Amino acid sequence: MANGFSTSPRRPILHHSPRFNLGSSSRLFCESTPIFIGTIPLHCPKGTCPPAQSHGHSSLRTNLNSSPPRCPQNPGTEPSLQPLGKVLQCGLSRGLHETLKVLQTPREELPLQISSQLPTSPSRLQSVPTSQHKPAYREAILHPRLPDVFYAAPNLRFVRKLPKPSQSVRQPRRSSRKLNDRLVSKPRSVSVLNPQVDSPLHTRRALSRQLQSARQRPRLAENLCDPNSIPEPVRVRPGILGPSPFPSYREELSNTKSRFSEDKGSDFLPNPPSSNSSEPGLPGRPSQAPSCASENLRRPLHLHSSNPNSPHFRSRWIRKNSVKQARVQLGHISSLGQSPNLRPLDSLLQASRVLHATSVSSYKTQGASHEECFKTRSDGITSSHSGHLHHNDRVEHQLQQGPLLQCSQDSLAEPTYRPGTPSLPNFCIAAKELSSTQPS
C-alpha cells in the first residue's frame, strides 16, 4: 500500500459513487504535498478517463496510472474486476476533479481604473468660498467600502502664507549666553504725538528731575500783628525739674487771651504808659514805640522772653498777684527762668527769715507769760494785759514792715522764694491770724 491506496487484487474494493465526500477526500490527500494544480476538463467519456496532468508528487502519478500486476490472473477470477478498477480510478478522479475545480476556480480579472479615469463628480469642481478656511471635502459623505475613492486635495490657493522674517532671532555661530539686542524686524515709523504736550497719551507720573523738594529753613521772624501767631509759653516746656505745677491748659489759654487783649489795647506794652516810674532792682522801662513801627516790627523766634531788650514780653514766672507769686517754690531762681536782675532780692529773703524767727520766739514767751498770769490774781491780770499790749505793738511793727519787704501788687517784679523758706505774704497772714486769736 503506497500513499494510502491498496494494490492487492485479493482485497475487496468498495465502489465510490460520484457523490464523493469532500471531507474524506480531503483527509486522504491532505497529508501529501501539493496536489493537482493543473486543470482537468469537466466532460469525460464514460468508459475511459484521461490521465491526470498534475505537477504533484511522482508516486501519486504512478499510483493513479498503475500497470497491471506481474502475475496473471487466474482463469477462475471474475472478469469484472478489471473494469471495476477503471471505474474506481474514474470515480476517484471525479472527486478530485470536483474538489480542484472549486479550489482553483480562476477569478475574473476586473479592470482597475486609474485615479485619473475616475468619473468626475460635480461636488469636486465647486470652488471653495473665501469665508471658509476648512477644506472642501467632508468625510461623512465617503463610503467605507470604496477604497478606490481618494480624498480631494484642498485648494492651496486660499491658504495664507506667513511672511518670512528678514532677520532671524538668533544669529548663526553666536554664543547662546550673549543676549541678542537686535530686533527681529525693522521698526516701523509710527506717528506719535509729542509727550511733552498735554495729550491723552501723556503719562500722568511726575517728573522727578523737574520737581525738587524745597529746603527746610527755620523761621527767623513772625508777624506780631497776627493774633494766631502767639508764641508758646515757657511754662509749657518741661525744664530740668520737669513740668511745673501750674493751672490747667484751659486756664492758661484764657489768661493768654486776656493778656493778649490787654497788650493789644496798650500798643503791645505790658503796663499802661502812665506808670513811668521804675521800681528799684529792675531795669529801666524802654520808651514807647510808635504804632506804625510796632506793626512793622519783626522779632526773632529764638529771643528769650526774659531778655530786658524785649519790649513786649516779660518773664513768665512773674505774677501781678503776690499770692500766686508765693506759690512758685520749685527749683532755683535761674532754673525757673528768672532774670539775673532779680538776684539782689536775696537780702530780702534773709530779712524774712529773721522776722520769722523773732515771731516764733515772741509767741513762745507770750504763751508762758499768759500761763503765769492766770496763776496770779490782780497782779497777773495787769501783767497779762501789759504783755498783750506789748505783743500787739510787735505785730503792728511787723505789719508796718511787711509792705516794705514784699512788693506791691501793682509792681512788675515780685520775688520768688526757694523751697523750705516761708514767703513774705504767708508770714504776714500768719501774723494777722495770731493777732486775731489772742484774748483781749
Swiss-Prot record:
<feature type="compositionally biased region" description="Polar residues">
    <location>
        <begin position="55"/>
        <end position="80"/>
    </location>
</feature>
<feature type="region of interest" description="Disordered">
    <location>
        <begin position="162"/>
        <end position="295"/>
    </location>
</feature>
<protein>
    <recommendedName>
        <fullName>Uncharacterized 48 kDa protein</fullName>
    </recommendedName>
</protein>
<feature type="compositionally biased region" description="Basic and acidic residues">
    <location>
        <begin position="249"/>
        <end position="266"/>
    </location>
</feature>
<feature type="region of interest" description="Disordered">
    <location>
        <begin position="49"/>
        <end position="81"/>
    </location>
</feature>
<dbReference type="Pfam" id="PF03251">
    <property type="entry name" value="Tymo_45kd_70kd"/>
</dbReference>
<dbReference type="InterPro" id="IPR004935">
    <property type="entry name" value="45/70kDa_tymovirus"/>
</dbReference>
<comment type="similarity">
    <text>Belongs to the tymoviridae protein p69 family.</text>
</comment>
<feature type="compositionally biased region" description="Low complexity">
    <location>
        <begin position="274"/>
        <end position="284"/>
    </location>
</feature>
